[in-house]
Amino acid sequence: MDVNPTLLFLKVPVQNAISTTFPYTGDPPYSHGTGTGYTMDTVNRTHQYSEKGKWTTNTETGAPQLNPIDGPLPEDNEPSGYAQTDCVLEAMAFLEESHPGIFENSCLETMEIVQQTRVDKLTQGRQTYDWTLNRNQPAATALANTIEIFRSNGLTASESGRLIDFLKDVMESMDKEEMEITTHFQRKRRVRDNMTKKMVTQRTIGKKKQRLNKKSYLIRALTLNTMTKDAERGKLKRRAIATPGMQIRGFVYFVETLARSICEKLEQSGLPVGGNEKKAKLANVVRKMMTNSQDTELSFTITGDNTKWNENQNPRMFLAMITYITRNQPEWFRNVLSIAPIMFSNKMARLGKGYMFESKSMKLRTQIPAEMLANIDLKYFNELTKKKIEKIRPLLIDGTASLSPGMMMGMFNMLSTVLGVSILNLGQKRYTKTTYWWDGLQSSDDFALIVNAPNHEGIQAGVDRFYRTCKLVGINMSKKKSYINRTGTFEFTSFFYRYGFVANFSMELPSFGVSGINESADMSIGVTVIKNNMINNDLGPATAQMALQLFIKDYRYTYRCHRGDTQIQTRRSFELKKLWEQTRSKAGLLVSDGGPNLYNIRNLHIPEVCLKWELMDEDYQGRLCNPLNPFVSHKEIESVNNAVVMPAHGPAKSMEYDAVATTHSWIPKRNRSILNTSQRGILEDEQMYQKCCNLFEKFFPSSSYRRPVGISSMVEAMVSRARIDARIDFESGRIKKEEFAEIMKICSTIEELRRQK
């Protein structure tokens, strides 16, 4: 029998059909090659939006800088970055008037955090520009290198372990006449391989000392490295994103802490909360506007889009905001917070890897690094690239481009939200002093504007006034990309609102399926995703049950672990059948060992091992949960792990899942190819660092890693802790006399070895 698909929707309210409009199947696009072109685009565009500003030269670095602040008022609808200082300050004052004490309280909260935050806060985060090696590194390594080099240059405040003291070192480093750094370089040589007798290129890594004068050091400290943003859907062109170095990171963190504290107190802010909490907060604003628009009033909502939010923001404006917000606070606090915007006003954008040229006829490839773009003959480039390079040339110093205006992506999300909310705040009747009024929602560059007025002309006037007010602070609402609707239907940060926020379950589709970490984690993540969607995204019981069955099927095909009594033949079926036959209680076998699936929508919260534990044969239990199993390199056994799940839209989300460590929780070995490259030394450093920290935390479970003062104290601390713990355990009868004696002996041996060294 044929089913007419329209019948499926007869009883469904239209907003529930949103999940059927899902356009994103398949993998998102990734970028390949160099990001240099995209970065030049960003730099050139940013300068174009501020072109009527004043040019100055930075006295320290010699970089030309464009300052659009208090520039000409716009005469057309083109996007521009000419924010007016007095307008921004006035918006801040009104925001404080409507929320008495908000800035004062947030400052006090932040001050407390500033004094308590430890340096290891900066090890969070992914790739970081490492100024010592002039390329990206994992955050922990970049921080370690920075502290190491500071120390060898006599800057040791950070040894206290407080972030604020590390920042003191950063400030002092900028006053130094020169900094001595250690950089890596590689030598290549041709050698004959003993096994294959072929010639191979062997790379060795060397370290060398290098002196940077004040100018070169400042340029590096102010540099943001750029990369191409990956996995962006619905865009034809890629775009560049920035990773700042360690000098900037700490200062940005404190500014964002203050701004986050303010955002938490603003009902129009979509940050820093997320998920259901965010939906509830936003629904309140909509409810307020709809209840207040009595029968006589009209209410319309704009689903807003801003043109190039980051490129029209200005760090100098943020400095003005911070100066105002912290005006009654102690001097040291105001100074710490104003450094981030000052550094951003003097920032340099690193152009990335440069361009790759290849000659088809001669089979030659050559890389033109970004440093050469300043003086290379342009005849080799196509017209488009020629124009870009010509435009950017006046701004280049050492392969980096001076970029004073603009903010780069994702740097001050919270603070720019405060600016956006301050304009929404001006929509109250006591400020508009007319019949129309507005309110709305702001989350970084995304906004929704709700305007109420007695008639259509009033609505139009309200929108126009909002548009023009935004222009005064460097926010450019795009008239082409924003659309207006009767209040009750709009979109904000990929949440669709229609008489309430609609659960758009299809957005989560990419995160269903097998993650490919290992058998244990994948099972746990799979059922957790289904559970979370039942809680948060209106995934109904019947659909969830079906999703579960599809997941189990997918899982069995991925790991070739079909049930022991199946007819399907795979590489593993011989072994699994054997296990099936010799197992007494077959229900106790894990799905990954060819067992049956015992999950249903009621028990998704229980890890599979726990679900089946009572059903398992004893010898199976012993094999499954055996920490001495030689085939498993065990991860740290924690009760909760974090998985990264990819929704269709927006950033990757971190999701917790229960981790029960079994012999199925294996970790694949690292790819060996890295061991032959220049990265090898860094990799070894990093592993050593990791091992030391892990060991230290075993002794002091709650410790956050502090760099010990003087090299010996870390080991000494662990030895003395081991002795104390052993004595307590011995006296309470937890360990035997022989074990106690052995521990004491090991401790003495360690001390002896240290003395000899």
Swiss-Prot record:
Renumbered ranges of motif Nuclear localization signal: 187-195, 203-216
Record organism: Influenza A virus (strain A/Hong Kong/212/2003 H5N1 genotype Z+)
EC number: 2.7.7.48
GO function term, MF aspect, one: RNA binding
Localization per Swiss-Prot or TrEMBL: Host nucleus; Host cytoplasm
Enzyme class of the recorded protein, top EC level: transferase
Name of the protein in question: RNA-directed RNA polymerase catalytic subunit
Compositionally biased residues, Polar residues: 55-64
Record's comment on post-translational modification: Phosphorylated by host PRKCA.
Described purpose of this protein according to its UniProt entry: RNA-dependent RNA polymerase which is responsible for replication and transcription of virus RNA segments. The transcription of viral mRNAs occurs by a unique mechanism called cap-snatching. 5' methylated caps of cellular mRNAs are cleaved after 10-13 nucleotides by PA. In turn, these short capped RNAs are used as primers by PB1 for transcription of viral mRNAs. During virus replication, PB1 initiates RNA synthesis and copy vRNA into complementary RNA (cRNA) which in turn serves as a template for the production of more vRNAs.
One cellular component term from this protein's GO annotations in UniProt: host cell nucleus
Region (Promoter-binding site): 249-256
Disordered: region residues: 52-82
Keywords: Eukaryotic host gene expression shutoff by virus, Eukaryotic host transcription shutoff by virus, Host cytoplasm, Host gene expression shutoff by virus, Host nucleus, Host-virus interaction, Inhibition of host RNA polymerase II by virus, Nucleotide-binding, Nucleotidyltransferase, Phosphoprotein, RNA-directed RNA polymerase, Transferase, Viral RNA replication, Viral transcription
Location (main, coarse): host cell
Top-level lineage group: Viruses
Family statement drawn from the similarity comment of this UniProt entry: Belongs to the influenza viruses polymerase PB1 family.
Pfam family, one: Flu_PB1
Catalytic activity: RNA(n) + a ribonucleoside 5'-triphosphate = RNA(n+1) + diphosphate
GO biological process: DNA-templated transcription; symbiont-mediated suppression of host gene expression; symbiont-mediated suppression of host mRNA transcription via inhibition of RNA polymerase II activity; viral RNA genome replication; viral transcription
